[in-house]
């Protein structure tokens, strides 16, 4: 039986994502998980793709751009508070923070994040500037 869960956004990051952004873990159910992502102002993530998960992101703060490529379809879109977007399975993606504040988003991962090896590096649209996770 599923129980109710409630969690406040942690003040410190839980991990560095494979794309180099800071991750604060929120809640998970059988069908998906929720996390908060933050990329410092002026930084560019590492381009990655996922092996088994799809994501939906909603941007909370900052300004930036998200590049996505799936097969022959490729686009770069501006992101800011109020913008949501999808990252279908197998999509190559990369994002950068172009404003004076960190770029912040919450993302739903479906199914829940399985762990190490889920994301793999791909050729991106911009040179990354963030540190790689260890």
Protein language model regions, located:
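A short, N-terminal "cap"/entry segment at the start of jelly-roll beta-barrel domains
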Residues: 1-36, 46-47, 117-134
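A short, compositionally biased micro-patch
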Residues: 29, 40-42, 52, 59, ...
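Short, mixed charged/polar active-site loops
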Residues: 34, 44, 73-76
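Short, conserved beta-strand element in jelly-roll/cupin
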Residues: 38-40, 51-66, 70, 108
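Short acidic-glycine-tyrosine-enriched beta hairpin
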Residues: 71-89
């Amino acid at each position: 039986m599923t129980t109710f869960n409630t969690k406040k956004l942690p003040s410190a990051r839980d991990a560095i994502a494979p794309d180099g952004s800071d991750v604060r873990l929120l809640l998970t159910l059988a069908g998906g998980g929720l996390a908060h992502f933050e990329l410092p102002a002026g930084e560019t993530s590492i381009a990655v793709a996922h092996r088994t998960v799809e994501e939906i992101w909603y941007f909370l703060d900052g300004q930036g751009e998200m590049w996505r490529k799936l097969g022959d379809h490729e686009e770069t879109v501006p992101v800011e508070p109020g913008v949501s977007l999808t990252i279908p399975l197998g999509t190559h993606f990369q994002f950068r923070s172009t404003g004076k504040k960190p770029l912040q988003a919450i993302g739903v991962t479906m199914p829940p994040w399985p762990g190490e090896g889920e994301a793999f590096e791909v050729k991106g649209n911009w040179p990354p500037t963030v540190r790689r996770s260890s």
